[in-house]
Amino acid sequence: MATVPALNAYRHLMRAARIAFQGDTQILSAAQVQIRNEFRQKASIDSTGASAAIQHAEEVAKVLRENVVQGKKTEEGKDTYKLRIHEHTERGDNESILTAGSGNTTGGGCCGGGGR
């Protein structure tokens, strides 16, 4: 792998795992082992494969950092959870949900057809 970009991707991935799994040492430890194993496996791939692997690692780090939240059950016997949403968690504006029922569709029917 390309040394500097691979090292940066490795660090970003480890940091993202720490953010995503903060407070859950068992899951964090398993994630770190998985990250190490994946990078060791790909240590001797060619430059074409290396750039794809680095890109994949950066994308995984982004998903971990922005889209993974932890939930802890609030009461036994109830299906309610307290979510740990942190500063890096992506928060959507729900625009697609707000406009979904407005009737402003561009296509129509299956696969953009006229619904006939």
UniProtKB/Swiss-Prot annotation:
Subcellular location, principal = mitochondrion
An annotated GO cellular component of this protein is: mitochondrial matrix
CDD domains, per database record = Complex1_LYR_LYRM7 (cd20267)
**Which top-level group of life is the source organism from?**
Eukaryota
Annotated Gene Ontology MF terms?
Answer: protein folding chaperone
List, alphabetically, the InterPro entries matched. Answer: Complex1_LYR_LYRM7, MZM1/LYRM7
Its annotated compartments are: Mitochondrion matrix
Question: Among its keywords, does the record have Mitochondrion?
Answer: yes
Gly residues: bias regions: 104-116
**Any one GO BP annotation for this protein:** mitochondrial respiratory chain complex III assembly
What's the subunit arrangement here? Interacts with RIP1.
Q: What does this protein do?
A: Assembly factor required for Rieske Fe-S protein RIP1 incorporation into the cytochrome b-c1 (CIII) complex. Functions as a chaperone, binding to this subunit within the mitochondrial matrix and stabilizing it prior to its translocation and insertion into the late CIII dimeric intermediate within the mitochondrial inner membrane. Modulates the mitochondrial matrix zinc pool.
Entry's family note: Belongs to the complex I LYR family. MZM1 subfamily.
Q: What is this protein called?
A: Mitochondrial zinc maintenance protein 1, mitochondrial
* Source organism (scientific name): Fusarium vanettenii (strain ATCC MYA-4622 / CBS 123669 / FGSC 9596 / NRRL 45880 / 77-13-4) (Fusarium solani subsp. pisi)
Q: Which gene encodes it?
A: MZM1
